[in-house]
Amino acid sequence: MIKFGTGGWRAVIADEFTKENIRLLMAGLCRLMEKEGLSGAEICVGYDRRFLSKESAHWAAEVLVGYGFHPFVINRSSPTPLMMFSVKKRQEPYGIAVTASHNPAIYNGIKVFTAGGRDADQTVTARIEAEIAQLTPADVRSVDYDEALEKGLITEANPMNEYLDSILAAVDVDAIKKAALRIGFDPMYGVSWSSLSMLLTTCRCDLEVIHDRHDTLFGGKLPAPNVDTLKPLAALVLDKHCDLGIATDGDADRLGVIDNEGQFVSPNKLLVLLYYYLVKYRGWHGPCVRNNSTSHLLDRVAEGLGEKCYEVPVGFKWVSAKMTETDAVIGGESSGGMAVRGHISGKDGIYAAALLVEMLAVTGKSVSELFAEIARQYGDPQWAEADFRMTHDHKAALQERLFVRGETPDFGKAVARICRDDGCKVCFADGSWVICRFSGTEPLLRMAAEADTQDEAERYIRVWRDFLKL
């Protein structure tokens, strides 16, 4: 069954991620576009470095041609933000990226983008699912890829230069050149290996690179930049005396950072740092947006700068929509995805990395020094998180307890409010909070907590875990 989650459709390769299902999904999208009066439109198709991604992109293009659409196929593995940029730049009504982003190597998937290069919202994906439900594999129309290419029914191109030029035009290249920074870079075997390297070397950064070869198994590790997966980058930063360490996830829409002391910088801090820099040092004005599992320190900083912070459900489509509605400066999530006003309407780890490098160059301060400046004014709340793998039956039982019976544990302190709009979030009277919610991309129950002390944040997680018998 094809079911879209918070980050598109993802499934295990050879289980549900099959040629048959890819063709069905694309046929469903084509039928939707036909009903919207878009017959014959150009549609962007891109793919990452995962196993079968290129082949899957070609299967998708074959179906588009079969229904009379004109695929614009990016002819090499590329960052997901490039696909979003292309949809926006070429004014295409839809686009797709074959990727499972930061998921384990056994997964692949498809992200769908709408006009302006936005993540397809729940209304669009529900309509695609409804169209798929009316189809059988025998109903799907297609034209052989090579035949369609020869007849000019498919366009192959690489808009990478346009994308990189748009980022270079948006950052202070001269300041970065003058700073002559040494950067450790870990693309995690993913698609940013050439694009981010080109961007940073154009800015005359001295690069030290690891894990840039094509490996569909991602070195046997999760292609997600976190405190565990970035230990090799931390060692590189210390060994090569780098000013900064940068990593991106498998499809380059998320950013991970190691500071000059070899310490992992949490995505929560990165979001706060970039918002603070853009408002305080660049002089921008406007609110910010975060999801419900992201640090409330962003709220404190926004309030201190005379701005507002908006909370939305998990799923970057909600962040993007609220950013557009409020003309927000930045929007992001605790997993490392962020978007900045004036660029694409979605998360972009490459652009975020460029802004972070500019931040160091312009301020002349390290990441830790700049965050200390923020912490002196707004505090430094502590963070804890944990993931628990779920079976289908276990998930159903927990959903019954959490969202039907509305059960919550006794945390032994005053509760300000409980919100069950997206997961179950308990906010306490002292400003601390804890949330548990089911992942929209993997069979996991995720928990996150924030409090004045690390012990208290971890206690919230333990209380939930014990209450749910995990």
Report residues per predicted region.
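An N-terminal, well-structured beta->alpha segment
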Residues: 1-67, 93-94, 148-183
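Buried hydrophobic positions in well-ordered alpha/beta secondary-structure cores of metabolic enzymes
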Residues: 7, 45, 83, 96, ...
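N-terminal small/polar loop signature for handling phosphorylated ligands or for N-terminal nucleophile
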Residues: 39-108, 198-258
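Proline/glycine-rich low-complexity loops and linkers
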Residues: 75, 130-163, 260-332, 338-339
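Gly/Ser/Thr-enriched, mixed-charge loops and adjacent short helices
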Residues: 108-238
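Gly/Ser/Thr-rich active-site loops/lids in small-molecule metabolic enzymes
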Residues: 121, 209-211, 263-282, 349-357
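Phosphate-binding and adjacent anionic-ligand microenvironments
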Residues: 238, 244, 284-470
